[in-house]
């Protein structure tokens, strides 16, 4: 993709910030198609289980909350100032899914060795057909463009390993996951199936009231207890599982005695939850700290916080995402 065109797209998107809101950015359909095609080639050229190095900043669900994505970058540093890993769910629910995914794809193309995107359960045609992305594409462009995004999403990697110690994915563990080569060997492009390893990596949830595996209230995949987290980490000589997929009040929440963390990066999710958003910073020594993007309060103030020593709390089962 032409560097000048790419830089122009990034500049347009980043400069959309208008006080506390972001204005709609109209990119040409041709430019968006080019973003999808170029990003797809890069996704397929890199492994399905990315092997990354710290320092890196890890972000959870963004869900079309474009102004909050820009706030994350303002706080963490716009690429290439920092390395980033996003854990999926870029589209649906929020008002600006197109701007959100286009900026993320543009950064992936420009900084392919420093900026990484995993697949979430909403990067799937059968889900984003229902929860807003299809309608946004159809209203602002056309259904063909939605199909182009689908082709791109079907090539996204599904997990990442940071310094061989922190395993990251959107959803969680799978009863089918015995070794990490199984993730490396998932063929792409692929649609998300209704069950099995790929489905679980994108859909599973931890459950503090459970031992072993349980039924998931979502009607898809499983829930897993702290025992399964400990067993998996010990077997693979890992320190931590980092995942997203659930709204948590403080933007991050520990589980299984700090062996698993949920990171959620869309504050005031859907305008319905009063949650904060968080970004997890992993430094060279693999120490994790959390930068908090507070939900704007009634007076419209925006707050930031930094916390690296919160006591662990189990994932909250309220909001589903």
UniProtKB/Swiss-Prot annotation:
Keywords assigned: Hydrolase, Manganese, Metal-binding, Protein phosphatase
Transcription regulation recorded as keyword: no
GO cellular component: cytoplasm; nucleus
Enzyme nomenclature, EC number: 3.1.3.16
CDD domains noted in UniProt: MPP_PP1_PPKL
Domain of life: Eukaryota
Key word Cell membrane present: no
Record's cofactor remark: Binds 2 manganese ions per subunit.
InterPro entries: Calcineurin-like_PHP_ApaH, Metallo-depent_PP-like, PP1_catalytic_subunit, Ser/Thr-sp_prot-phosphatase, STPPase_N
S-S bonds: none
Entry-linked Pfam families: Metallophos, STPPase_N
Reactions catalysed: O-phospho-L-seryl-[protein] + H2O = L-seryl-[protein] + phosphate; O-phospho-L-threonyl-[protein] + H2O = L-threonyl-[protein] + phosphate
UniProt: Mn(2+) 1 binding residues: 61, 63, 89
Active site (catalytic residues): 122
Region called Disordered, residue ranges: 298-321
Cofactor(s) named in the record: Mn(2+)
GO MF: metal ion binding; protein serine/threonine phosphatase activity
Binding of Mn(2+) 2, residues: 89, 121, 170, 245
Similarity section: Belongs to the PPP phosphatase family. PP-1 subfamily.
PANTHER family: SERINE/THREONINE PROTEIN PHOSPHATASE, SERINE_THREONINE-PROTEIN PHOSPHATASE PP1 ISOZYME 6
Protein name stated in the entry: Serine/threonine-protein phosphatase PP1
Taxonomic source organism: Medicago sativa subsp. varia
Taxonomy of the source species: Eukaryota, Viridiplantae, Streptophyta, Embryophyta, Tracheophyta
Gene label: PP1
